[in-house]
Amino acid sequence: MKVLWAALVVTLLAGCQADVEPELEVQEPAVWQSGQPWELALGRFWDYLRWVQTLSEQVQEELLSSHVTQELTLLMEDTMKEVKAYKSELEQELAPMAEDTKARLSKELQAAQSRLRADMEEVLNRLSQYRGEVQTMMGQSGEELRARLAAHLRKLRKRLLRDVEEVQKRMDVYRAGAQEGAERSVSAIRERMGSLVEEGRLQSLPSQPLRERAQAWGEQMRGRLEKVGSQARDRLEEVREQMEEVRGKVEEQAEAFQARFKSWFEPMMEDMRRQWADLIEKVQVAVGASTAAPSQKS
């Protein structure tokens, strides 16, 4: 029996020691201090979150309002905007790569971006939840709520760091692919130029100097440019004729409408003038008759 009690005491002491054992601090990524713009933006989000995690009196006061979540939201949007801009920049450099490779890399990076954004949004949701819990208190003390929040924020920071590292890895793969594609493109251009030079050297004849070949090439290019210019002028003239035709049709329709409107409006006005004249004449006759009646009575 004493052995069982001793074992129980040892177990309880070990559990208490495990509860109070300090948790290892998340290592701060040094690359955020001098990295890409998206890494610097993410560093600002990280620093602000670290300040929130201190749960100082100022932090606790600001957590009761929406100031902290609004600030973190702005930092999150700034970070994701920089990530998107850097991804677009790398995608432009990936042009020489195969389409299936580009699609695969883009899909992997997009998934890492989504996880990173989800981590940030979960931080915002947890802080909003804490504000609601403090306002209601739901039978819990403020110390308990702060302890739960601190533990949850530590887990979220670890997850955030893990997903940030994943985004960095995908960005590195993107960057390596862009460099490889650029080198492959330059190599292909160099080989093509070398083959053209060699071909020109083999085909050159002693009776045809390089200057004559250059002049012939220039005449050929001039002819092509003149042909293109002539085609462009013809097309422009065709468009101009079409515009003139459209304008003529519009003017014709406008004149026809004006004529129809005039044929409808003028008879109506003439009829109104005639009716008005008849009305005036009747009024004058009536007035004259009323004036003549007293004269006859006298």
From Swiss-Prot:
Start and end residues of each stretch annotated as LDL and other lipoprotein receptors binding: 152-162
Sequence repeats: 74-95, 96-117, 118-139, 140-161, 162-183, 223-244
UniProt-listed GO biological process terms: acylglycerol homeostasis; cholesterol efflux; cholesterol metabolic process; lipoprotein metabolic process; melanosome organization; phospholipid efflux
Positions where Phosphoserine occurs in the chain: S141
GO cellular component: chylomicron; extracellular exosome; high-density lipoprotein particle; low-density lipoprotein particle; multivesicular body, internal vesicle; very-low-density lipoprotein particle
Region annotated Lipid-binding and lipoprotein association, chain positions: 204-272
Region (8 X 22 AA approximate tandem repeats): 74-244
List of residues binding heparin: L156, R157, K158, R159, G218, E219, Q220, M221, R222, G223, R224, L225
Modifications made to the protein after synthesis: APOE exists as multiple glycosylated and sialylated glycoforms within cells and in plasma. The extent of glycosylation and sialylation are tissue and context specific.
Annotated GO MF terms: cholesterol transfer activity; heparin binding; phosphatidylcholine-sterol O-acyltransferase activator activity; phospholipid binding
Methionine sulfoxide found at: M137
InterPro entries: ApoA_E, Apolipoprotein_A1/A4/E
Alphabetic keyword roster: Chylomicron, Endosome, Extracellular matrix, Glycoprotein, HDL, Heparin-binding, Lipid transport, Lipid-binding, Oxidation, Phosphoprotein, Repeat, Secreted, Signal, Transport, VLDL
Subcellular location: Secreted; Secreted, Extracellular space; Secreted, Extracellular space, Extracellular matrix; Extracellular vesicle
Signal peptide: 1-18
Predominant location: secreted
A Pfam match: Apolipoprotein
Annotated region described as Specificity for association with VLDL, given as residue ranges: 260-272
Function: APOE is an apolipoprotein, a protein associating with lipid particles, that mainly functions in lipoprotein-mediated lipid transport between organs via the plasma and interstitial fluids. APOE is a core component of plasma lipoproteins and is involved in their production, conversion and clearance. Apolipoproteins are amphipathic molecules that interact both with lipids of the lipoprotein particle core and the aqueous environment of the plasma.
Family named by the database record: Belongs to the apolipoprotein A1/A4/E family.
Subunit details: Homotetramer. May interact with ABCA1; functionally associated with ABCA1 in the biogenesis of HDLs. May interact with APP/A4 amyloid-beta peptide; the interaction is extremely stable in vitro but its physiological significance is unclear. May interact with MAPT. May interact with MAP2. In the cerebrospinal fluid, interacts with secreted SORL1. Interacts with PMEL; this allows the loading of PMEL luminal fragment on ILVs to induce fibril nucleation.
Listed name of the protein: Apolipoprotein E
Biological source species: Dasyprocta punctata
